[in-house]
Protein backbone atom coordinates (compact mmCIF):
# COMPACT_ATOMS: atom_id res chain seq x y z
CA UNK A 1 0.00 0.00 0.00
CA UNK A 2 1.20 3.50 -0.76
CA UNK A 3 1.58 5.98 2.02
CA UNK A 4 2.83 5.84 5.54
CA UNK A 5 -0.35 5.89 7.64
CA UNK A 6 -1.39 2.74 9.51
CA UNK A 7 -5.19 2.62 9.71
CA UNK A 8 -7.56 0.38 11.67
CA UNK A 9 -9.30 -2.24 9.55
CA UNK A 10 -12.72 -0.56 9.58
CA UNK A 11 -11.19 2.71 8.34
CA UNK A 12 -10.05 0.86 5.22
CA UNK A 13 -13.56 -0.35 4.33
CA UNK A 14 -14.42 2.80 2.34
CA UNK A 15 -11.02 4.28 1.55
CA UNK A 16 -9.27 1.08 0.39
CA UNK A 17 -11.94 -1.62 -0.09
CA UNK A 18 -9.55 -4.05 -1.80
CA UNK A 19 -7.14 -3.95 1.14
CA UNK A 20 -10.04 -4.25 3.59
CA UNK A 21 -11.34 -7.33 1.72
CA UNK A 22 -7.91 -8.96 1.88
CA UNK A 23 -7.39 -8.37 5.61
CA UNK A 24 -10.94 -9.09 6.79
CA UNK A 25 -10.33 -12.70 5.69
CA UNK A 26 -8.32 -13.12 8.91
CA UNK A 27 -11.65 -13.19 10.73
CA UNK A 28 -13.18 -16.15 8.88
CA UNK A 29 -14.73 -18.34 11.55
CA UNK A 30 -14.49 -15.47 14.04
CA UNK A 31 -16.84 -13.00 12.37
CA UNK A 32 -18.38 -11.99 15.70
CA UNK A 33 -15.18 -10.06 16.42
CA UNK A 34 -16.02 -7.69 13.56
CA UNK A 35 -18.96 -6.31 15.55
CA UNK A 36 -17.55 -6.79 19.06
CA UNK A 37 -17.54 -3.62 21.14
CA UNK A 38 -14.60 -2.32 23.11
CA UNK A 39 -16.61 -0.50 25.75
CA UNK A 40 -13.77 1.51 27.35
CA UNK A 41 -12.87 3.03 23.96
CA UNK A 42 -16.49 3.24 22.72
CA UNK A 43 -15.68 1.56 19.43
CA UNK A 44 -15.54 -1.80 17.68
CA UNK A 45 -12.73 -4.40 17.69
CA UNK A 46 -11.67 -3.36 14.18
CA UNK A 47 -11.81 0.38 14.88
CA UNK A 48 -8.48 0.06 16.68
CA UNK A 49 -4.93 -0.82 15.77
CA UNK A 50 -3.74 -4.03 17.41
CA UNK A 51 -0.22 -4.14 18.84
CA UNK A 52 1.86 -6.62 20.78
CA UNK A 53 4.81 -6.04 23.08
CA UNK A 54 6.19 -9.45 22.06
CA UNK A 55 9.11 -9.14 19.67
CA UNK A 56 8.74 -10.72 16.22
CA UNK A 57 11.88 -12.74 16.91
CA UNK A 58 10.27 -14.28 20.00
CA UNK A 59 7.13 -15.10 18.04
CA UNK A 60 9.27 -16.97 15.49
CA UNK A 61 11.13 -18.84 18.25
CA UNK A 62 7.84 -19.91 19.84
CA UNK A 63 6.44 -21.05 16.51
CA UNK A 64 9.63 -23.07 15.94
CA UNK A 65 9.16 -24.71 19.38
CA UNK A 66 5.81 -25.89 18.05
CA UNK A 67 7.38 -27.25 14.88
CA UNK A 68 6.24 -24.37 12.68
CA UNK A 69 8.94 -22.80 10.56
CA UNK A 70 8.30 -19.43 8.96
CA UNK A 71 10.45 -19.39 5.84
CA UNK A 72 10.01 -15.74 4.99
CA UNK A 73 11.34 -12.64 6.68
CA UNK A 74 8.68 -10.13 7.62
CA UNK A 75 9.02 -6.48 8.54
CA UNK A 76 7.35 -5.14 11.67
CA UNK A 77 7.01 -1.57 12.91
CA UNK A 78 8.50 -0.82 16.30
CA UNK A 79 6.05 1.70 17.74
CA UNK A 80 7.26 3.76 20.71
CA UNK A 81 5.01 3.46 23.75
CA UNK A 82 4.75 7.26 23.85
CA UNK A 83 2.72 7.18 20.61
CA UNK A 84 0.10 4.73 21.84
CA UNK A 85 -0.28 5.52 25.52
CA UNK A 86 -3.10 7.67 26.79
CA UNK A 87 -6.88 7.76 26.70
CA UNK A 88 -7.10 6.10 23.27
CA UNK A 89 -5.31 2.94 24.35
CA UNK A 90 -6.23 -0.11 26.37
CA UNK A 91 -4.69 -3.50 27.13
CA UNK A 92 -6.45 -6.78 26.56
CA UNK A 93 -4.79 -9.46 28.68
CA UNK A 94 -6.41 -12.84 28.24
CA UNK A 95 -7.80 -14.53 31.29
CA UNK A 96 -7.12 -18.24 31.74
CA UNK A 97 -10.82 -19.13 31.85
CA UNK A 98 -11.69 -17.71 28.44
CA UNK A 99 -12.53 -19.58 25.27
CA UNK A 100 -11.00 -19.03 21.84
CA UNK A 101 -13.32 -16.05 21.45
CA UNK A 102 -12.59 -13.95 24.54
CA UNK A 103 -15.02 -11.95 26.59
CA UNK A 104 -14.29 -8.60 25.02
CA UNK A 105 -15.54 -6.70 28.04
CA UNK A 106 -12.42 -7.58 30.06
CA UNK A 107 -9.85 -4.86 29.51
CA UNK A 108 -7.41 -2.99 31.66
CA UNK A 109 -5.88 0.44 31.36
CA UNK A 110 -2.75 0.25 29.24
CA UNK A 111 0.13 0.79 31.65
CA UNK A 112 3.62 1.20 30.14
CA UNK A 113 5.02 0.05 33.50
CA UNK A 114 3.53 -3.40 32.82
CA UNK A 115 5.40 -4.03 29.56
CA UNK A 116 7.00 -7.17 31.03
CA UNK A 117 3.50 -8.60 31.57
CA UNK A 118 2.47 -7.65 28.03
CA UNK A 119 5.68 -9.19 26.59
CA UNK A 120 5.07 -12.61 28.10
CA UNK A 121 3.93 -15.33 25.71
CA UNK A 122 1.81 -17.73 27.76
CA UNK A 123 2.71 -21.42 27.65
CA UNK A 124 -0.86 -22.01 26.48
CA UNK A 125 -0.03 -20.11 23.30
CA UNK A 126 2.85 -22.46 22.48
CA UNK A 127 0.62 -25.47 23.24
CA UNK A 128 -2.03 -23.99 20.96
CA UNK A 129 0.60 -23.61 18.19
CA UNK A 130 1.53 -27.29 18.64
CA UNK A 131 -2.12 -28.41 18.48
CA UNK A 132 -2.78 -26.38 15.34
CA UNK A 133 0.40 -27.66 13.70
CA UNK A 134 -0.48 -31.28 14.54
CA UNK A 135 -3.92 -30.84 13.01
CA UNK A 136 -2.52 -29.17 9.90
CA UNK A 137 -4.24 -25.88 10.66
CA UNK A 138 -2.68 -22.44 10.59
CA UNK A 139 -2.49 -20.90 14.08
CA UNK A 140 -3.54 -17.42 15.06
CA UNK A 141 -0.18 -15.82 15.91
CA UNK A 142 -1.48 -13.79 18.84
CA UNK A 143 -3.83 -16.31 20.45
CA UNK A 144 -3.79 -15.68 24.22
CA UNK A 145 -0.98 -13.12 23.76
CA UNK A 146 -1.71 -9.74 25.41
CA UNK A 147 -2.97 -7.12 22.97
CA UNK A 148 -2.41 -3.38 23.18
CA UNK A 149 -5.26 -1.65 21.37
CA UNK A 150 -5.04 1.90 20.07
CA UNK A 151 -7.98 3.92 18.76
CA UNK A 152 -6.52 6.02 15.99
CA UNK A 153 -4.13 5.97 13.06
CA UNK A 154 -0.34 6.15 13.18
CA UNK A 155 2.15 7.66 10.77
CA UNK A 156 4.85 5.04 10.23
CA UNK A 157 7.20 7.27 8.24
CA UNK A 158 9.76 7.67 11.04
CA UNK A 159 9.25 4.37 12.85
CA UNK A 160 11.99 1.79 13.18
CA UNK A 161 11.40 -1.40 11.18
CA UNK A 162 12.34 -4.73 12.72
CA UNK A 163 12.82 -7.75 10.45
CA UNK A 164 12.26 -11.30 11.62
Give the predicted meaning of each segment.
Residues 1-50, 56-164:
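Active-site-proximal loop/hinge segments that shape catalytic or ion-binding/gating pockets
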Amino acid sequence: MDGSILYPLNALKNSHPEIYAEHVKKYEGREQLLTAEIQPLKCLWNDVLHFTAVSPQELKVNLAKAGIEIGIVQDWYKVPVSIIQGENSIAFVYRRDQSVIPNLKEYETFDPEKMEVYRKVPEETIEYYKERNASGKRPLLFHIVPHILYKGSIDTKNLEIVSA
